[in-house]
Amino acid sequence: MADGRALPPGQFAGKAFVRFGLGRFRNKRVAHEGPVALSLEGLVSEAGTVSAEQLGALERVRQVSDFHCVTTWSVANVAWEGVRFADFCRAIARPLPEAALVVFHGLDGYRCAMPLEDLMAHDVLLADRVDGAPLGLAHGGPQRLVAPAHYGYKNVKHLAAIEFRKSRRGYSFPFPYPGLMDHPRGRVALEERAQFLPNWLIRPIYKLFVPRAVRK
């Protein structure tokens, strides 16, 4: 990276933080510009909607972290602002003891799952600002997940619902993409890009997606 830090395994330094996504979602238009009342679902103390006022009562934080796309590019020092997922979880969601998995659903129909234990890290945010400006629809506004230790496909954009589950049973990666593209954890440091496929094979395949997956 430009600041001298080593890149994670298999990554190269990208030139800019661009809108990027799977083909079905990269150019999908999301109508909501203003605050969205999140739907809270599944194994929680009380399911329902989470208002902007509830989120606004949580401590706001600003953090600078790196973003790593599973297709092998990285961008250093992206400045995010929002609330910690751990604070949201303890104060608002209050998941039941058996909850172990969280599925994030986007307004664009995208969804992805992460283990609850990974989401409790101090740098996991529900973000609404990036680089000093409102998030905007290009980068997942009005609100998105930011989990710097995990590949970008886990960082769901345009959040509409947060669902707490016991396990991955009944969960599926969005059609038509195969489930093997969705690693159960997706940690960058361990290069958990996909299920079952070796990284020597998946790296060059994913690199081919880079020019095709940038928003037009």
List PLM regions with ranges.
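Extended, aromatic/histidine-rich regions of cofactor-dependent oxidoreductases associated
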Residues: 1-38, 43-44, 91-216
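A glycine-rich, hydrophobic loop/mini-helix early in the fold
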Residues: 28-84
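Short acidic (Asp/Glu) patches
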Residues: 51-53, 84-90, 127-130
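Residues that form generic nucleotide/phosphate-binding pockets
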Residues: 58, 88, 208
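Extracellular-facing segments of soluble proteins and assemblies that are Gly/Ser/Thr-biased and enriched
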Residues: 68-108
